[in-house]
Regions:
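Hydrophobic beta-sheet segments that form the core/acyl-binding groove
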Residues: 59-96
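Short coil/turn motifs at secondary-structure junctions
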Residues: 12, 82-83, 94-98, 108-112
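Hot-dog-fold acyl-thioester-processing enzymes
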Residues: 1-56, 102-104, 111-180
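"Short basic amphipathic alpha-helical interaction patches in structured regions
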Residues: 89-95, 106, 119-123
Length: 180
């Protein structure tokens, strides 16, 4: 079963060509997951009050079409079967019934006081569960050792990047990645 929310795309989530950025898409799917957590429990705020935080480990996003300012969209999210300390979650974004984007993610649940990871089996929740997505790009890949890497820039994490958990919100990574 999937949790779905309806949105109108904000103009501030678009670029110079009026196309929604990767970060914009990430914001809608994150908000949808936040709504699911609030509706089914435990909520993001409840986790925060318990000294727990979900931290992203891996994210794969496939974008099949463009979104523009003021488009009416539906974002869906669902938890997937998870084991160990890896919490799996998937997302989709549709406009007029057409799939525009999909994402698959792996999260860790952290005890913020001790820094210890919390096992799936030690985290009771009511989040709806459905089948995982099969994306055209796996969230598990390694760069070959012979690929040359070079520093292309540096970025300081600023106040507006940081969320309630005291770390850079995962939706900011899209802007950083696309900015270089």
């Amino acid at each position: 079963m999937k949790w779905t929310e309806s949105y109108t795309v904000n103009a501030h989530d678009t670029d110079i060509n009026d196309i929604v950025s990767l970060t914009g898409i990430m914001r809608y799917i994150q908000d949808c997951a936040h709504c699911q957590m609030a509706g089914e429990g435990p909520s993001y705020d409840k986790l925060h009050s318990q000294g727990k935080a979900f931290v992203i480990s891996r994210l794969a996003v496939s974008i099949y079409g463009k979104l523009y300012a003021h488009d009416k969209i539906k974002a869906s999210t669902w938890a997937c079967d998870s084991t160990g300390v890896s919490f799996n979650r998937c997302y989709s974004v549709e406009r007029d019934g057409k799939k525009i984007a999909e994402a698959s993610s792996i999260w860790a649940l952290l005890d913020t006081a001790s820094g210890r990871l919390i096992r799936v089996s030690d985290f009771p929740n009511n989040y709806c569960v459905d089948e995982p997505l099969e994306l055209d790009m796996s969230s598990h890949f390694r760069l070959p050792a012979d690929v040359p890497l070079a520093l292309v820039g540096e970025r300081t994490v600023e106040y507006q990047d940081v969320d309630i958990n005291g770390h850079m919100n995962n939706t900011r990574y899209g802007d950083i990645l696309c900015g270089y």
